[in-house]
Regions:
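Non-catalytic C-terminal accessory domains or segments of carbohydrate-active enzymes
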Residues: 2-174
Length: 174
């Protein structure tokens, strides 16, 4: 399969045109992906991302959205700055622009986070996992409360507890 060089998409919206990604990339043959754009996530408008969505976790007024960086295509986010009081980024860089925040130079992993504090105090987080970590994400509900676990162990849960099953004497969950 051949690679596709200098790939960039142009999305024309009512009031603006998005170029996704900002810099043209090479897409390896056989690669497939879904990049979200113009999507409201708990009241924060994600204008686009070159990361793939996995799942979300609601914790009271706060919400966390999990994404992963796929097939060596650099992850980037463009988030509307409307209704955002503060933005913090770990393991990446951001700059405020006229229409929002541009986040790039991500180092994917469990600690790669974007935290947007909305004007009402609610927090919306974006976690950018590696492709491998995305294979080990588990989501469920215990006693009416959602949970997300990242572990390469097998996982069983019921209404009371989570059990990790692994041949190793100790295992890790995040």
């Amino acid at each position: 399969r051949k690679d596709y060089k200098n790939v960039q998409f142009t999305v024309k919206l009512k009031n603006e045109t998005l170029r996704i990604p900002r810099k043209k990339v090479t897409v390896k043959g056989g690669t497939y992906f879904l990049w979200p754009f113009n999507q409201s996530l708990s009241g924060v408008l994600l204008k686009y991302s070159t990361t793939q969505p996995i799942c979300s976790l609601a914790e009271g007024n706060n919400n966390t959205y999990f994404f992963f960086e796929d097939d060596l295509i650099p992850g980037e986010y463009f988030i509307d700055n409307k209704d955002i009081q503060d933005l913090k980024v770990k393991n990446g860089t951001f700059r405020k622009e006229k229409n929002g925040y541009f986040i790039d130079q991500l180092t994917p992993g469990k600690e790669c986070t974007i935290e947007a504090t909305k004007n009402n105090g609610a927090i919306v987080r974006f976690v950018t996992l590696t492709e491998e970590e995305s294979d080990y994400i588990w989501k469920g509900t215990i006693k009416g409360k959602e949970f997300v676990v990242i572990s390469n162990s097998s996982l069983i849960y019921d209404n009371d507890k989570i059990t990790l099953i692994d041949e190793r004497p100790s295992t890790e969950a995040w």
